[in-house]
UniProtKB/Swiss-Prot annotation:
Biased composition (Gly residues): 20-32
Protein name as annotated: Kelch-like protein diablo
Cited CDD domains: BACK_KLHL20 (cd18459), BTB_POZ_KLHL20_KLEIP (cd18249)
Positions bearing Phosphothreonine: 19
Domain BACK: 174-276
A GO cellular-component term linked to this record: Cul3-RING ubiquitin ligase complex
Higher taxonomy: Eukaryota, Metazoa, Ecdysozoa, Arthropoda, Hexapoda
UniProt key word Transmembrane: no
Organism encoding this protein: Drosophila erecta (Fruit fly)
Length: 623
């Protein structure tokens, strides 16, 4: 072990006076020869100390006294249960007890006080909290704890209970939690429950709680501009489901409720064929008037400026966030079919339906809100088959026409409504072939080939051009870049990257093309650079935290994510995100599977039961 600073020499006290042999010292006119005198350092005037242990130790001792019923000066009688305590502790923790014991109330002079309208178990938990600063809120006690905390004015416990209930929100219970919050004047919880209900209305309307709503609460919900629905038809259907749950008692409220359905925003077909033909609607004069009003709005567009009102105002549904899909790839020595979805708002990866085939080196892109997986290698053979994923149904279909060539390590992108497959290899040679898919015709057709054969190529669309970036010509990695102009069916070279890269990740972000990772002649890369189409130049950005070949790169909700890959020794399941403001990458979670050569695609979060809006997050049911 190394010496401490100053070791090897003898240090003297700062205020020591040393007199050596042959020296002179004068004190009070005398002298001393050959002696050493050491003066004591002056004592400090103050020494301040604050104990961090004291509050906890004191509370612990006070609680022990309470447990042993020592020095207790009050007994709380709650539901027949006697709880011993100290007035000073209760008064310090609770405004309710402080007012009781320090004022002129009769209880201030009593040694036993009866507390009514409170659950005895909840009271015991709250008294324990006063002495220990600890409480466990759970599903079995929150409905008694919250009203008890409200009564005793224990604001901290009220907040904890509300936070717990906020985390429990789902479409089957949000209306009950909303009513509970309203009853106990928990305004923040009420606001969040309202917002959750509005944003997840399509799922809430199918719950039993919705069918049991009092008419006033139903009106409060459906009159909101923030109701998140695809069309006003859903609101009408929800109202009629509620009505028909108990027609005998509720038909009297139909007009009151229907006036908050925005009938003028319905399609003419639905208004006439469904609303206008409903027997309950037709039998109520006020309802018929509402239908006629909507018909006039639809039939007389020139009069609409004079007919504006709450029923003609479009709702403002929530803008759904984007989610990232990681598709296929190579893991643990084999191609995989698994697919998972990343939600940046929760930072969670969730498995979704797998593809029908294992695919590594797969090309992935999103066209018309559907996710396409193109080609790849299944571990035994090269593929030309295509699969298409619908996030609304969580299902893959294989009814897409195959590409004209088998392709793995292929680049895939969407330009002008067409899906392009660029380069790759077919098991015999590296390809420069390019073809595009027309979803209306379910047909692939060839376009002009690239000037260079490229496998492990990255592709990007910017400014109406399709860029093919890097890759390998079958012999060595490339730094060359070319772009395709669909108007002239022609490829033209642009400035090369500063680094040769194959199996790189590529994405368009803030009007730049970002190229990250990949592999050069020698090793996997962590470096990254970006292309400015205005100046036709590449410039470096900060390197990723890991080397990544076979990496996926995508922009999700305005952030750039690098997903998976291979670092030279291990397949990766980590992801990292780039911040252009700080020019830094940071790790932000892991996939369920390690993936090399998987594809990535970005879509709007679907409106299904698997996506539940909650304050600043999406919540999985029963998770």
């Amino acid at each position: 072990m190394g010496d401490l600073p100053g070791s090897g020499s003898t240090a003297q006290p700062r205020d020591a006076a040393v007199t050596g042999t042959g020296g002179n010292s004068t004190a009070g006119g005398g002298s001393s020869v050959g002696s050493t005198a050491v003066d004591r350092p002056p004592s400090p005037a103050r020494l301040s100390h604050t104990s961090e242990k004291h509050p906890k130790v004191t509370l612990t001792e006070l609680n022990m006294l309470r447990r042993h019923r020592e020095l207790c000066d009050v007994v709380l009688n709650v539901g027949g249960r006697k709880i011993f305590a100290h007035r000073v502790i209760l008064s310090a923790c609770s405004s309710y007890f402080c007012a009781m014991f320090t004022g002129e109330l009769e209880e201030s002079r009593q040694t036993e006080v009866t507390i009514r309208d409170i659950d005895e178990n909840a009271m015991e938990l709250l008294i324990d909290f006063c002495y220990t600063a600890h409480i466990m809120v759970e599903e079995s006690n929150v409905q008694t704890l919250l009203p008890a905390a409200c009564l005793l004015q224990l604001v901290e416990i009220q907040d904890i209970c509300c936070e717990f209930l906020k985390r429990q929100l789902d479409p089957t219970n949000c209306l009950g939690i909303r009513a509970f919050a309203d009853t106990h004047s928990c305004r923040e919880l009420l606001r969040i429950a309202d917002k959750f209900t509005q944003h997840n209305f399509q799922e809430v309307m199918e719950s039993e709680e919705f069918l049991l709503l009092p008419v006033g609460q139903l009106v409060d919900i459906i009159c909101s501009d923030e109701l998140n629905v695809r069309s006003e038809e859903q609101v009408f259907n929800a109202v009629m489901s509620w009505l028909k749950y108990n027609v005998a008692e509720r038909r009297q409220h139909l007009a009151q409720v229907l006036q908050h359905v925005r009938l003028p925003l319905l399609s003419p077909k639905f208004l006439v064929g469904t609303v206008g033909s409903d027997l309950l609607v037709r039998s109520d004069e006020a309802c018929r008037d509402l239908v006629d009003e909507a018909k006039n709005y639809l039939l007389l567009p020139q009069e609409r400026p004079l007919m504006q009102g709450p029923r003609t105002r479009p709702r403002k549904p929530t803008r759904r966030g984007e989610v990232l899909f990681a598709v296929g790839g190579w893991c643990s020595g084999d191609a995989i079919a698994s697919v998972e979805r990343f939600d940046p708002q929760t930072n969670d990866w969730k498995m979704v339906a797998p593809m029908s085939k294992r695919r590594c080196g797969v090309g992935v892109a999103v066209l018309n809100d559907l996710l396409y997986a193109v080609g790849g290698h299944d571990g035994q053979s090269y593929l030309n088959s295509i699969e298409r994923y619908d996030p609304q149904t969580n299902q893959w279909s294989c009814d897409v026409a195959p590409t004209t060539s088998c392709r793995t390590s292929v680049g895939v992108a969407v330009l002008d409504g067409f899906l392009y497959a660029v380069g790759g290899q077919d098991g015999v040679q590296c390809l420069n072939h390019v073809e595009r898919y027309d979803p209306k015709e379910n047909k692939w057709s060839k376009v002009a080939p690239m000037t260079t054969r490229r496998l492990g190529v990255a592709v990007a669309v910017l400014g109406g051009f399709l860029y093919a970036i890097g890759g390998s010509d079958g012999q060595c990695p490339l730094n060359t870049v070319e772009r395709y102009d669909p108007r002239h069916n022609k490829w033209v070279a642009v400035s090369p990257m500063s680094t040769r890269r194959k199996h790189l990740g590529c994405a368009v972000f803030n009007n730049y093309i970002y190229a990250v990772g990949g592999r050069d002649d020698c090793m996997e890369l962590s470096s990254a650079e970006r292309y400015n189409p205005l100046t036709n130049t590449w410039s470096p950005i900060v390197a990723m935290t890991s080397r990544r070949s076979g990496v996926g790169l995508a922009v999700v909700n305005g952030q750039l994510y690098a997903v998976g890959g291979f670092d030279g020794s291990a397949y990766l399941k980590t992801i990292e995100v780039y911040d252009p403001e700080t020019n830094q990458w940071r790790l932000c979670g892991c996939m369920n599977y390690r993936r090399l050569g998987g594809g990535v695609g970005v879509m709007r979060a679907p409106q299904t039961e698997n996506y539940m809006w909650c304050e600043n997050s999406f919540k999985q049911p029963n998770s």
